[in-house]
Amino acid sequence: MGDFQSRYEILAAIMGPPNTASFKEEEHSGSQTKNYPVVVKCIQEHDPVDTTNVLVADDLDSNFEPFSITDDYGKYENTLVSHSSTILNEPYNESPSSSSSDSSSRSTSPFSQLSSQSLRLNAEEIAPSSLINKAVQSTLRLSEPLVSPIKCPLSEQFINFINQQDSDKVVLIRGFLLPHLASLTTKNVSEPELDKLRHSLYNWWVSILRRLQSNISTSERITYTKAILAIAKHHCWNKVEHSALLYLEHQLILYDTLTFVVHLLSQKSLPYSLTTFCASILVLSFFQLPLFADHFLSALDVKKKYIDALGSSFDEKIMIISHKYLAPFFTDQFSSTMHPYYPKRTSTPFTIGYNRQPIEFTRAWMRRFKSSTGGFFFEFLSCYHSFLALQFSFELPDNVIYFAPGYICLHAYLLELTISVIHISDKKPLMLPTGHEQFPCKTLPEVNPSMEEYNPKMPVTATTLSTLQQFVGHIKDAFKKIGDCRQEQMRLLAVLEQVLINVAKNTPAFNLQSCFLLCSLVEQCFGVFNDFSHRFDFSFWISVAKRLISTSHNMSIVRSITFIYAVWPYLDIKSKELVTLQWLLEENTFQELFLHWSPLVRAYFQRLVCWRFLKLDDMEEFQFKGTVTLRVKNLLKHYFTAQALYHEECLVNGRASPITKPSEPVPMRRLTIVCNHYQNYGNSESTEFELSNYKQDDGTIQALVTDVVSISNSFSSGLKKAFGSLFKNVSGLPAETEIAYHHTLSASNSYVFTDLVDNPDSMLKSTLKYRFVFKFSPSQPLSSLGKNKEKYDALLERSSHGVLPVQSKMLLYNSNHISCPLSSIKGVSVNGKRLVYTSRALVEWALVVNEFDHALSLRKGNETEDMEAPTLTVRIPKSYASNIYN
């Protein structure tokens, strides 16, 4: 019985060195070959080994027809049994398989038939027949018996696995192999015992891989892939390189499995049951096959600017000590893939030698990494992080993990994919140097770019939103799959935050579609941060919102407002103070938005102030909200004083008095509040639907109409298509139920907020089950609804003391806020050009406050803290977008 060294020498004599001359001839033969998984035609026990007897299966079509097995498979099983029966009585002696002999019989290219017969290798020319038979017999046994008399269950069950039928094989794997591997440990196991265990698992691996390549059902395929992953990921393979023969066996079978995976990825469609299997094998090959990481990262072709952008986010001092901490986990072959690493383009295919067919990184299978919606890259990334979580200890210094093999390069590729999702063009960057807080004047060339830079393809279509939602869905799935390791989740969360920051830095400020999608992406990712308890730095995103507002483009300003509105629940007190007291409620900024010339901007900003800044969500924010309330009250009183002075000036100079009638947010349109079911759409803060143009149905009764926001109870084809049976009105009741009550409402109440029904308490819910969404929908012009100047004047008169929501008034009862320095204002004079909008803005604000109070009145008792704020979203109407650019 030969020892391990003799077995290795015999195998090497049969296979030749890693790069044989005959293999090099094959590379230059010029024949067109295709990559296929290997199916070895096995031989009888005493037949000489012919390394040319290799079967190649046909291509897999879209229906995934696996490789066929020849009749010699039965001979292979009988051979295994005959060899295994002679060693069953040896204590803990691993059962034989054709795996070792397979290694010798696969010395030729196992994945394609050579076009030239002269290139085929003959085993007799490499080694004599007696030496080959000796190698086969040697690889079927292990040299040293164990001291323990206990038999190895893996060896015994492997013989049963060979002799059983196909269905029984699956039962054996489910009932024995998978549970046994889950409980199998290598603690206090000697090296000889560990080597025999590895060889036994190698036999299982080879046999299961052959079964996986055959024509099997989906359930069997899932079982076989789980078994291979359980074997390949088992910790017994750690430091297998110390044993030359076992390391060779492990490299060969892993390479064969990788070749099978590459063939699967090259098919037109990949079964979902094989996605995790393929990604896991690629990750194992990335870390365990020499030079595969270099070829793989080179094939991804990540741009250098993205690697630099992401790599610069981490401290370079950590790179100096990173090799010291990472050396115990990785061999020297990975030193070239650690940061800083820029993949070098290479045209040579990847191979481990031993006459294995090289793997070419063609578009046929690398295309799965290029798709941002396919999800395979995210599956690979989650498996990558899972592997690191198992390998690294928790005592590593901060940021050392970022210098692991391929870490920066892979996440730079994530940055590149993210940028491609929102269709970034190489134009002006979004961010300006720090300190750019003032609104630019109209003469700056960057404020008034050419018409080409505006990109008039305005509406964000359902396709782009669907792509974005799929992208974020893959990100969420990646975090869930590494849920067993909280530290690895935190590392990926930190990298994702840096990815989003770099995406914003590469976003053109005047490409509205990119800006819209960027805001939607960040809003959803902030929800991911909140779900996984990641604290992010919001100061950068405040500068992003400032940059959008500084463009002076109406829709960019509206999108920045809705962005703040959507992410508000995820902010801490410090971030909320930065948004309110140090930015939006600062005198100049508040005047710019509250008295903006566009009624659409005013409508959105006023709802941001009312529903977010003044609404009390948590009693812990009582002090902060009191300061904000006083600041808003003082600003409103200041604007009313300015309006009164301007009104007197107009009377003295004989000019027309300022108009008090509110303006429509969008010409010939109104904002409509509709409801989407809370359970159906989850916690999304930006659920959006595109409502097409349609005419109001005849007989529809207008329930409640205001000049800034209108609450529509009409059923239309567009609303039915978007919401179906879940369509509700503002009270959360079916529209038909309330329309009956609305017949009793007089036309005189159309412009004031009154109870929708005579007895609203009878139909109220104790908890809010729907969240509201502001939407555009067509309506008749407000001018046709009648004149109610007296009511507008009454609303304006109330502004003399500052109109505040009822809920906010309780904050003023706390005397500690009276002398709060942050609540005072400097009394900045109102710009003369904006005085004309003061009266309208104050009336519109009063209507917004009434709208808020009316929603609170629909709540039972005083349960206002848990009340959901409306989801404020924006979609640019097509007609409005076309009018902007024409």
UniProtKB/Swiss-Prot annotation:
Q: Which residues form a coiled coil?
A: none
Give one Pfam family: DUF1765
Any transmembrane segments, and where? 277-297, 374-394, 400-420
Write out the annotated subcellular location. Membrane
Q: Where is this region: Disordered?
A: 87-112
GO MF, one term, reads: MAP-kinase scaffold activity
Give the principal location in a single coarse category. Answer: membrane
| UniProtKB keywords | Membrane, Transmembrane, Transmembrane helix
Name of the protein in its database record: UPF0592 membrane protein C7D4.03c
